[in-house]
Amino acid sequence: WILSSHSHSAPILCPIDLYDGFSPYFAGLKDRIICLITNLMSQLQPVTIHFGQSNCDFNVNRRLVDTNGNCRMAPNIDGVVDKSVPVISCRDINNSLVGILFSYCCHPTILLGPKISGDYPGWAQNSLEKKHEPVVALFLPGVFGNVRPYFGSGDRFRPGTESDVISCGYELANAVEEGLKDSYHVPTEVIQAWRIKPQLPLDKPLSMEELGKIASQSIASQSENDSTNSWKNGFNIARR
C-alpha cells in the first residue's frame, strides 16, 4: 500500500472522479519508493520512540446548517472538528532526533492548481526538516472528512493563496515543535496495533427528491467558494 497525503494541487495517484486510470506520475513514484525502501533496509538503526501532542487552530468544520435545515459549504465555528496534533518522534542511541511523524485533521486544499504544491503539510515538513536537519518529517492525514482551512472571520471560504499555505504550514510546524517539547518515551513492549470494523445502524434511505436537493445545495455552495477555472486547471495538470 502507498499512503499519500493528498492535496488539490498535486498529480493524481489513483483513479478518481473523471480521471479513470493510474497516472504516469504514479508509476514513476512507485519505482522510486521501492528503490528508496530497499536502500533504507540496509541502513536500519536502533531508536527510541516518543509521543507528544499539541493543538493547531486553522481548521474548521465546513458544513453549515441553517434554521431551515439547509446545508451549505461555509465555516461552521461550532461544528465538530479535531484540533489536536499528535506527534511521534524517533531518537537514535545518542538521543538525537532522526524522524518525526505528525498528523492533523484538515483537508490540504488551500491551493487548487495549476502549480504543483504539497500545500500546508508540505510546507510544515520542509520547515521541520530545515530546523532539525537531517531529520525526516512525515505527515499522516487525520480524520478530516468535513474539515478545511479557514483564514478569516467571514461567513464564506475565500480562495487560498501561497501566503496562506506558508502561514498555515508554519503554524502547524510550530504546533509540532510544542508536541516534541512535551513528548515522553514510549516503551516498545507497550506498543500495540489493532483493526476493527464497527457496524453502524442505517437510517431510512433518502428519496431521490431529497438527494437531488442536497446535491443542488452542494453545487451551489461550492460555486460560491471556489473558482471553477482553478478546479479545471488543477484537474488538467494532474492528468499530465
Predicted stretch roles:
Residues 1-240:
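Non-catalytic substrate/cofactor recognition surfaces at enzyme active-site rims
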